Amino acid sequence: LDIEYFFTDTGEELDEVYEYLNMLEGYLGKPINYLDPKRDFKFWMTQYNNFLPSAQARWCTVRLKLTPFEKWVDEEFLQKGIKVKSYVAIRSDESFREGLQSKKEIETVLPFKENHIDKQAVFEILENSGLGLPKYYEWRSRSGCTFCFFQRKIEWVGLMERHPEAFENAKRMEKTALDNGSPFTWCQSESLVELSKPE
């Protein structure tokens, strides 16, 4: 297979993500294309009336992940008549996930789902390859940008302890959102200010 690897960089990733991508490039022996959305998270937040993204309004995924990917595929492949298959790492134990659909010219393939590979099997593949798991799995259950709204509360506590500057940045964004009438906080039912108060 002629595979091009890519990473859609939101500009709000944990340092551990970049460390792992560097290791992965060495393992693959091929560069990973970093796709830049051109406009950062804060720009798009202002475009969405300073509302935070949520499970119901995932503008961050569309603007910072899907749109740059589609642009790259269109310019590098589709306009040149090259057919594209996009391999998406949704696992077999994630039956609730379908992934955001991109352009109809891009065929989406879900190899983990198709081959019944669950989270434990993915971890085993990574361990057996010698790569191991990304360091953020020491305290997080999933990948995603620094302040992904899918994080559990304990993961926000982990962010506060391990990356206090990123946690403070997320608090500032949340305050901006709340000051502008956003119905969402990063965590369901409690703000990061409340979460960070000692008990």
Question: Across the structure, where does each feature detected by a protein language model lie?
Answer:
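Nucleotide-activated chemistry modules centered on ATP-dependent adenylation/adenylyltransferase
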Residues: 1-199
